[in-house]
Design a protein with these regions (language model features):
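Cysteine-nucleophile amide-bond enzymes
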Residues: 1-182
């Protein structure tokens, strides 16, 4: 499953404005020793117990999405997905959302786990230039990170793109989605 939330960080406020979506953070959930654990990119790529992950979001709101064709996720495929995620464990967070593999951001990690482990591409990449940076937080983040060298053609996959994927179905939602400020 893929968990989505809105984090209270300044970056997440900017991502919400740029993507017009309240879903600004995501991770892949695996069951480890009978407990749900979220594999996420937040500092280093790491495993976070579900209860801790929920606390990092706004008002405990979480949406759980699942692959519509769940039968594709056989035990062997899930093992391959975990192996794909393991390769990124400990890597630093990518504040520039660059399409390399040295640093990882949250939605990139999710997409990589599904693509490398299951051969399934969830979410569509878009160009930075196609996002809306007119909001105050989004504009500030863009200027702080890139200065005058805005990479308009740089591909990026956002939590919003993953959330909208036609390959996924919502299976649970807890709490209310926050309102995004534009």
């Amino acid at each position: 499953d893929i968990f989505f939330q809105h984090s209270g960080s300044m970056q997440c406020a900017a991502v919400a404005q740029a993507t017009h979506s309240p879903y600004t953070h995501c991770g892949v959930v695996f069951i480890e020793s009978g407990t749900p654990v979220v594999w996420e990119a937040v500092g280093p790529v790491m495993r976070t117990p579900y209860a801790d992950w929920v606390e990092h979001g706004v008002d405990g709101h979480v949406v759980v999405k699942r692959l519509k064709r769940i039968e594709l996720l056989t035990p062997g495929v899930v093992a391959a997905m975990k192996a794909a995620g393991e390769r990124d464990m400990g890597k630093p967070y990518d504040i520039y959302f660059a399409p390399d593999t040295d640093r990882i951001y949250c939605s990139e990690l999710v997409q990589r786990i599904y693509r490398s482990g299951a051969g399934i591409r969830i979410g569509e990449e878009q160009r930075f230039g196609d996002m809306d940076f007119s909001g105050a937080e989004a504009s500030r983040m863009l200027k702080d990170r890139f200065g005058e060298r805005f990479p308009a053609d740089q591909p990026v996959v956002t939590p919003a793109s993953l959330f909208r994927s036609a390959l996924l179905v919502t299976v649970d939602s807890v709490g209310s989605a926050p309102t995004i400020m534009r």
